[in-house]
Each structure stands twice: as structure tokens, then as C-alpha cells.
């Protein structure tokens, strides 16, 4: 197995992008859930 710096760099970039995408997804989910929770509490109180 030979060492190819550009291949390693592209794998690292893909890995970082995957982590960033997951982080954005979790953040969006958390914001959506908190907004839905606030709306639901207001709605249930009447």
C-alpha cells in the first residue's frame, strides 16, 4: 500500500464535510423542535 497525499487529503475533506453536514442537520433539527415545542405550548394553553 503506497502513500498518496492527494488521496488522503480528499478523504479527510470528505470526512470533514460529512461531519459538518451532520452538525448542520442536528442544529436544524434542534431549532425546528424547539420552535415546534414553543408553538405547541402556546397552542395547548389556548
From Swiss-Prot:
Keywords: Capsid protein, Formylation, Helical capsid protein, Host membrane, Membrane, Transmembrane, Transmembrane helix, Virion. Self assembles to form a helical capsid wrapping up the viral genomic DNA. The capsid displays a filamentous structure with a length of 760-1950 nm and a width of 6-8 nm. The virion assembly and budding take place at the host inner membrane. Homomultimerizes. There are several thousands of this protein in the phage capsid. The chain crosses the membrane at residues 18-37. This is Capsid protein G8P. It is found in: Virion; Host membrane. The lineage of its organism: Viruses, Monodnaviria, Loebvirae, Hofneiviricota, Faserviricetes. GO terms for cellular component: helical viral capsid; host cell membrane; membrane. Residues 38-46 are cytoplasmic. It is a single-pass membrane protein. Residues 1-17 are periplasmic. It comes from the Viruses. Belongs to the inovirus capsid protein family. It comes from Thermus phage PH75 (Bacteriophage PH75). The gene is VIII. The modification N-formylmethionine is found at residue 1.
